[in-house]
Amino acid sequence: HDDSTENAGNFGDDTIAGGADDDVIFGQLGDDDIHGDGLLVNGALATLTATIADSDVGGDDYIEGNGGGDTVYGGLGQDDITGGSSSLYNLTTPAMRPDGADTLYGGNGDLVARNNYGETVVDEAGDSVLPENERHARDADMILGDNGNIYRLVGTNGVDSGSLLTFVYDNYATERIVVRAAELLDYTPGGHDFDPASAASDIGAGDEIHGESGDDFIYGMVGSDILFGDAQDDDLIGGYGHDWISGGTGSDGVLGDDGRI
């Protein structure tokens, strides 16, 4: 899995379905089609039918598209999606982390119209509506367009809490957002100390990313990216390139290049 094998013909364009529950998926080289909460029916990818309130179907998935131009659907749940690769699983050098132009969806790829709060919010019986304060966490994703490490925090000040750190907007919500952090790889952030020589070797391409429902964090990184926050309160950072960014419905934080929100 490196630059020398990227075009050697020893990899395939894969279709991968994680099914229900919490999955860890790697596309590796090739132009892959990955669905964190999907299933295969006679070799074809299908979507698990679920409402945003159905916790038995959507899992909190970890997905790396790896090399190639991949299409990734996180599905329901708080998913961590990297269009390229991390350094957490033996891909320790930049040469081992080639990346292409990816299309990444935090959900199932459903169209989220203007002033729409995302997926249908009903219970399993189809009767009651999930409150607005529950919608923020149910499908809150972190998505990196290119290479990077996504961490879920388990403690502060060197103390392991024994479980994932979470937070909630008020005391009446039962769904809690998992606290996460991102480490950008093979990427040179802008700023007063920007190093153009280092940026010349950055790895990545122009990606299209849709957060869909939930409070999403999206970082386009290298290339001219197209970013959609869609429903709820999202943070979107375009990174290097001529990016097109739409926050969508909700109170969003948007940076065209690099910085902190």
Language-model region placement:
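Acidic, glycine-rich low-complexity segments
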Residues: 1-261
